[in-house]
């Protein structure tokens, strides 16, 4: 479902991406009000936010996801779908870098090779277009930052997301109000069908994220880890086959190097998993 969001936002390409993000935040906040009310989590949410340092981390997480959403939607409506795919492919490598530089984790040989391949791939892709692939890097860094910050926030997935969109709601309403007077704004120019699409932005945001959070708590990591490549793979195919974005030799080489790096990480994750160890001769039975 997450991978289909590219098609969703592409249908709204005529509107300013900053206005679209403001509506996304507003609609997500409306959905989360309903979710928190139905699940009776207001007291848990407010008590969780009173804990030391939580509000500051929620604000930082909200800003990180705001950057991610904004760059992603801007790129989709301006014809840079392939670069969004690259960004989400790079994100696992960016996560490894954060683990080493911030958390102090050590790099295995396979991950060293993967990181080097990722860096070379970004350089090749940058040279192929004559500029730094800032869309891909911004998406990767913002998504990695968001994931890192979420690990430090002692709130459930539902409470955390609610707190984030509630924090972003006031700026979003200001943006909507400031831009609604323009002739090409959502208020001034949207058709009935486009209004319906925009009104669904909250569900399009909340449902995939909730499903992912649910799976993350119940599905083994060896099964869950490869699924993070599904969304960028869908975006890659959409950008190439549906939206006919250029895929020259340099881009093919760059993407191929990223895929090899991710294959190394995935293979290592599977081989090091307890389930795999139990299947090996001499492994501890479950």
Predicted region positions:
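Membrane-interface interhelical linkers
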Residues: 30-60, 109, 161, 166-198, ...
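Helix-helix packing/entry segments at the starts of transmembrane helices
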Residues: 86-90, 157-167, 206-241
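Hydrophobic transmembrane alpha-helices of multi-pass small-molecule transport proteins
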Residues: 32, 110-128, 139-141, 250-269
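C-terminal-most transmembrane helix of multi-pass membrane proteins
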Residues: 229-286
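Glycine-/small-residue-enriched transmembrane alpha-helix faces in small-molecule transporters
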Residues: 1-22, 120-152, 174, 238, ...
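Structural motif at transmembrane-helix junctions in multi-pass transporters
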Residues: 14-20, 70-87, 210-227, 246
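C-terminal transmembrane-helix exit sites in multi-pass transporters
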Residues: 74, 91-110, 233-252
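Hydrophobic alpha-helical transmembrane segments of multi-pass membrane transport proteins
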Residues: 1-4, 8, 59-76, 138-149, ...
């Amino acid at each position: 479902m997450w991978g289909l969001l590219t098609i969703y936002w592409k249908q709204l390409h005529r509107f300013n991406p900053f206005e679209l993000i403001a509506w996304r935040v507003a609609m997500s906040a409306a959905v989360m009000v309903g979710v928190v009310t139905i699940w009776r989590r207001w007291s848990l949410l407010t008590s969780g936010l009173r804990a030391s340092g939580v509000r500051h981390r929620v604000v930082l997480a909200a800003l990180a996801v705001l950057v991610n959403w904004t760059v992603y939607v801007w790129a989709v409506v301006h014809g840079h779908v392939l670069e969004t795919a690259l960004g989400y492919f790079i994100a696992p490598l960016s996560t490894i870098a954060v683990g080493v530089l911030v958390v102090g984790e050590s790099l295995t040989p396979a991950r060293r090779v993967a990181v080097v391949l990722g860096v070379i791939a970004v350089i090749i892709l940058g040279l192929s277009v004559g500029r730094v692939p800032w869309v891909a890097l911004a998406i990767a860094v913002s998504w990695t930052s968001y994931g890192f910050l979420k690990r430090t926030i002692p709130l459930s997935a539902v409470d955390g997301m609610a707190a984030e969109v509630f924090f972003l709601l006031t700026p979003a309403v200001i943006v909507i109000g400031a831009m609604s007077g323009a002739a090409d704004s959502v208020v001034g120019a949207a058709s009935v069908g486009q209004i319906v699409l925009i009104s669904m932005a909250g569900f399009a945001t909340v449902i995939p994220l909730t499903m992912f959070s649910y799976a993350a708590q119940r599905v083994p990591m060896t099964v869950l880890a490869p699924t993070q490549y599904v969304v960028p793979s869908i975006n890659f195919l959409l950008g190439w086959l549906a939206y006919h974005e250029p895929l020259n030799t340099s881009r093919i080489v760059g993407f191929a190097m990223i895929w090899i790096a991710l294959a190394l990480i995935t293979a290592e994750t599977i081989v090091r998993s307890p389930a795999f160890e139990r299947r090996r001769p001499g492994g501890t039975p479950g």
